[in-house]
């Protein structure tokens, strides 16, 4: 397949989004799953400190101390003095058990991150290959996780090993040469650094297609590497075209991230990355390699105009969201209870620090700019909703954890706010939309956890695939709600109450 044809095929697939994008919505779910591991580690450490009365000693030692850190523009000495005043009170926390829990949590988070990323990659590439064969992408994705997970993991391990050996060898060679001194050290550095960089880039270029070869050819690591090298040798122009396209995508997103970091709205880059750039690039490289192997027959692009499809999709998303709320009231009740329980926990846990630490909604709104704030709120809140929902696929635990943590944060802010009435006035207009959306997203995560468990026990991949498609449309509907909430939060909530308070 020629690069132009691969690009057209990718765009055609993306115009029917519900059979490929759901697995790319798993990208923000990865961080939610890892955060759940970290939250569990923190909970274990806190329970240990409570059971051994160390937590009580810490709270007693902190009583009466200045817990509010100096402002960011304060001299460095002020931070040093503040840290020195706090450190003795935290000494009961420094125990071997807490250290062991911290190390175990970090290791568990790394392992879980690697496992989830590999599983998500297998699902994404399987969905791409399935759609490019004009088959059901979600069904291919669900089946592909178990089929290709191990091989893709080994591919990633091999690539990391090559990078590690190359970097260590280059650093050791340069260090020895520089210790020898003179022009020899400089010459060796000039030669070794570019050579090592070339090896790293070559490895990345090969392994970019190797994971695709695992899925398209249904082979192990060795055959996938050989297939990739053959593809690059036979189709160098196609491979280079993909590398250029990928570089443009990465550089473009990076430049946009820098720009939006300055003017505001940086979370938009995250949404653009997982909702368009990543699936587009994966579809292109899968089309190129699959075309080389003769395994793809891309679907035709729909005849309907893009604007009409977009409007129809938004309406369908709203309908699916309403339907989901109506057919799962028990899950929404449970999700609301978890969120409320988190709020109570946050309020209670912040009690000992309420007099020493304060937050201010007025301070947070001091530099408020409505347009960029609206974009930031919409993109960030929807990304959180997507992550919490699809993170629920891991037995619903990450979805419940996300609800609990959000509740805790809300409770802490409410307890430590300097002007509670002002905070309530600010939250009320957009909160009547945003908080129910959070509950629906959490309920969707709980639902997907149950479906995933039943699918695994009953070996029913089609049922899970269908629920993933439906979840995609529910999240589209939640996106509409959260955009409206963001507009209210950006343009109404910070201003309407000021004449009255």
What do the predicted segments below correspond to?
Residues 346-405:
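Transmembrane helical segments that form the transport core of multi-pass membrane transport proteins
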Residues 171-195, 257-269, 356-364, 413-427, ...:
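Membrane-interfacial helix-loop-helix connectors in multipass membrane proteins
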Residues 84-112, 374-394, 398, 408-415:
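Individual transmembrane alpha-helix segments
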Residues 241-250, 392, 429-448:
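Alpha-helical transmembrane segments of helical membrane proteins, especially in multi-pass transport
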């Amino acid at each position: 397949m020629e690069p132009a044809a691969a690009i057209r095929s990718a765009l055609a697939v993306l115009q029917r989004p519900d059979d490929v994008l759901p697995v790319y919505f798993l990208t923000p779910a990865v961080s939610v799953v890892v955060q759940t591991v970290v939250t569990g580690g923190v909970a274990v450490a806190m329970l240990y400190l409570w059971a051994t009365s160390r937590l009580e000693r810490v709270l007693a030692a902190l009583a009466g101390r200045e817990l509010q850190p100096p402002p960011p523009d304060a001299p460095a000495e002020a931070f040093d003095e503040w840290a020195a005043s706090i450190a003795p009170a935290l000494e009961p926390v420094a125990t071997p058990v807490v250290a062991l829990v911290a190390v175990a949590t970090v290791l568990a988070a790394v392992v879980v991150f690697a496992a989830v990323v590999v599983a998500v990659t297998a699902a994404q590439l399987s969905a791409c290959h399935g759609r490019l064969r004009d088959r059901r992408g979600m069904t291919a994705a669900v089946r592909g996780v178990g089929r290709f997970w191990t091989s893709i993991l080994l591919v990633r391990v091999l690539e990391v090993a090559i990078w590690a050996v190359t970097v260590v060898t280059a650093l050791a060679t340069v260090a020895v040469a520089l210790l020898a001194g003179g022009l020899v050290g400089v010459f060796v550095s000039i030669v070794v650094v570019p050579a090592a960089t070339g090896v790293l880039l070559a490895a990345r270029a090969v392994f970019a297609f190797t994971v695709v070869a695992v899925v398209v050819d249904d082979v192990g690591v060795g055959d996938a590497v050989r297939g990739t090298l053959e593809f690059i040798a036979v189709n160098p122009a196609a491979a280079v075209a993909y590398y250029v396209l990928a570089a443009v995508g990465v550089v473009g997103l990076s430049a946009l991230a820098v720009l939006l970091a300055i003017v505001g709205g940086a979370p938009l880059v995250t949404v653009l990355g997982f909702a368009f750039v990543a699936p587009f690039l994966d579809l292109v490289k899968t089309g190129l390699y699959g075309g080389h192997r003769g395994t793809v027959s891309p679907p035709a692009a729909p005849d309907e105009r893009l604007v009409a499809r977009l409007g129809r999709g938004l309406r369908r998303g709203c309908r699916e969201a309403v339907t989901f709320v109506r057919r799962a009231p028990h899950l929404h009740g449970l999700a609301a209870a978890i969120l409320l329980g988190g709020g109570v926990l946050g309020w209670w846990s912040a009690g000992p620090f309420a007099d020493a630490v304060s937050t201010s909604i007025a301070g947070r709104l001091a530099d408020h700019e409505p347009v960029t704030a609206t974009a930031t709120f919409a993109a960030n809140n929807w990304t959180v909703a997507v992550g919490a929902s699809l993170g629920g696929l891991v037995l619903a635990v990450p979805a419940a954890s996300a609800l609990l943590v959000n509740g805790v944060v809300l409770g802490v802010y409410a307890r430590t706010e300097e002007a509670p009435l002002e905070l309530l006035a600010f939250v009320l207009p957009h909160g009547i939309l945003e908080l129910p959306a959070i509950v629906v997203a959490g309920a969707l995560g709980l639902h997907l956890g149950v479906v995933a468990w039943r699918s695994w026990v009953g070996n029913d991949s089609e049922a899970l695939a269908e629920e993933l498609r439906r979840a995609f449309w529910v999240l589209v509907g939640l996106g509409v709600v959260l955009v409206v909430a963001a507009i209210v939060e950006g343009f109404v909530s910070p201003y309407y109450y000021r004449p009255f308070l």
